[in-house]
Swiss-Prot record:
Name of protein: D-alanine--D-alanine ligase
Lineage: Bacteria, Bacillati, Bacillota, Bacilli, Lactobacillales
Pathway: Cell wall biogenesis; peptidoglycan biosynthesis
GO biological process, one term: cell wall organization
Residues that, per the record, bind Mg(2+) 2: 300, 302
Gene behind this protein: ddl
Primary location: cytoplasm
Species of origin: Streptococcus pneumoniae serotype 2 (strain D39 / NCTC 7466)
UniProtKB keywords: ATP-binding, Cell shape, Cell wall biogenesis/degradation, Cytoplasm, Ligase, Magnesium, Manganese, Metal-binding, Nucleotide-binding, Peptidoglycan synthesis
Binding, Mg(2+) 1: 287, 300
HAMAP family in alphabetical order: Dala_Dala_lig
EC number: 6.3.2.4
NCBIfam families xrefs: D_ala_D_alaTIGR, PRK01966.1-4, PRK01966.1-5
C-alpha cells in the first residue's frame, strides 16, 4: 500500500507565491511508485481548499490551485486534512507557515509532518531571537541593532549610527525570502527602510552591511544531522531581495562554492551546531556571509527553504549524490521518526 503525502501549500504570508512554486516542484518529483499525493491549498484569507490528488505523475498541463484560481466549493475545515498514517509536507514559507503555527496545528491533529517542530520553527523564524540563541552557542553574527514597535525610533536610529556604519540592511524580524529588506546609505534612507520593514512585522533588525559572499549549507536529519558542501549565491544585483530571487532571475548558484577546505569545514560545523542549538528536525538551510576579510558570519537558518527544482537546497543535496525524489523520501522517513519519538515522550 502506498504512503500518502498531504501537501500543504499557499498560505497567508507574502511568500505564498513561492510556496506554490515549491509545491508544484515537489508534486512532480515524488516517486509515485511509493507515494500518493493529496494537495490542500491555504488561501490568502487562511481558508483550506481541497485541491488535486495524484496517484501517478502529473502531466505538464497540471497546475496547482492558486489565489487566482480558487474553487470555493472545495473549501473544507482545516481538520479535513487528517488521514491516518499520512505524512504532511507543509511547503509553506514565512509567517503562518514555517513559524510554528502550522506545526502546532499538525501536532494537535496527531499527524507526522516534514521539518522542524514548533519550537525550532518559531525560533528560527524570528531573526532577532535566532541571533541571540546563536550568539549563546558561540557562533559569530553580523553586528546588529534590534528595534521593536513602540521604541523611540529617533533614539534607535542614534544607536544604529553609534554602533554600526552605513550602509546598513533593515529586515523584518519575522519574515523570509528577503521580503521587506532594504539597504540604507544614510539616515533618511534608514527611516524609509524602517517604515517598510514595520509593514511586515512589529520587530525589526538593522544589520551592519558587509562586503561578503553569500554561502549556503544544506542540513538533513533529526538528531544525527548531516550537512552538504556549501554553495554560493552569485548575484548580478546590489543585494539579494525578493525580486532578484524569484522574479528577475538575476541570481545564479555555484555548487560547490569555490572556497578553501578550512572555510568549508568551519561553515559545515557551524551549520550543524546552529541546527542543534535551535533543536532543528528534518531539514534547514544555513546561510553565511563570507567577507573579503575572511570573516564568517552565520546570517540565518531557514527551516523550510525554497523547494523548487532550481532552489539551492535540493541542488546542494543533488551535489552530495541525493536526488530530488530521494530527498523527499528521506524527509518523509525523518518526519515519521520524529513523530514516533514525540508520541513516545507523551506519558
Amino acid at each position: 500500500m502506498k504512503q500518502t503525502i498531504i501537501l500543504l501549500y499557499g498560505g497567508r504570508s507574502a511568500e505564498r507565491e513561492v510556496s506554490v512554486l515549491s509545491a508544484e516542484s515537489v508534486m512532480r518529483a515524488v516517486d509515485y511508485d511509493r507515494f500518493t499525493v493529496k494537495t490542500f491549498f491555504i488561501s490568502q484569507s487562511g481558508d483550506f481548499i481541497k485541491t488535486q490528488e495524484f496517484s501517478h505523475a502529473p502531466g505538464q498541463e497540471d497546475r496547482l490551485m492558486t489565489n487566482e484560481t480558487i474553487d470555493w466549493d472545495k473549501k473544507v475545515a482545516p481538520s479535513a486534512i487528517y488521514e491516518e498514517g499520512a505524512v504532511v509536507f507543509p511547503v509553506l514559507h514565512g509567517p503562518m507557515g514555517e513559524d510554528g503555527s502550522v506545526q502546532g496545528f499538525l501536532e494537535v491533529l496527531k499527524m507526522p509532518y516534514v521539518g522542524c517542530n514548533i519550537l525550532s520553527s518559531s525560533l528560527a523564524m524570528d531573526k532577532i531571537t535566532t541571533k541571540r540563541v546563536l550568539e549563546s552557542a558561540g557562533i559569530a553574527q553580523v553586528p546588529y541593532v534590534a528595534i521593536v514597535e513602540g521604541d523611540d525610533v529617533t533614539a534607535k536610529i542614534a544607536e544604529v549610527e553609534e554602533k554600526l556604519a552605513y550602509p546598513v540592511f533593515t529586515k523584518p524580524s519575522n519574515m523570509g525570502s528577503s521580503v521587506g529588506i532594504s539597504k540604507s546609505e544614510n539616515q533618511e534612507e534608514l527611516r524609509q527602510a524602517l517604515k517598510l520593514a514595520f509593514r511586515y512585522d512589529s520587530r525589526v533588525l538593522v544589520e551592519q552591511g558587509v562586503n561578503a559572499r553569500e554561502i549556503e549549507v544544506g542540513l538533513l536529519g533529526n538528531y544525527d544531522v548531516k550537512s552538504t558542501l556549501p554553495g554560493e549565491v552569485v548575484k548580478d544585483v546590489a543585494f539579494y531581495d525578493y525580486d532578484a530571487k524569484y522574479i528577475d532571475n538575476k541570481v545564479t548558484m555555484d555548487i560547490p562554492a569555490k572556497i578553501s577546505d578550512d572555510v568549508v569545514a568551519v561553515m559545515r560545523q557551524n551549520a550543524e551546531t546552529a541546527f542543534r542549538a535551535i533543536g532543528g528536525l528534518g531539514l534547514s538551510r544555513c546561510d553565511f556571509f563570507y567577507t573579503d576579510k575572511g570573516e564568517i558570519f552565520l546570517n540565518e537558518l531557514n527551516t523550510m527553504p525554497g523547494f523548487t527544482q532550481w532552489s539551492m537546497y535540493p541542488l546542494l543535496w543533488e551535489n552530495m549524490g541525493i536526488s530530488y525524489p530521494e530527498l523527499i523520501e528521506r524527509l518523509v522517513d525523518l518526519a515519521k521518526e520524529s513523530f514516533d519519538k514525540r508520541e513516545a515522550h507523551l506519558i
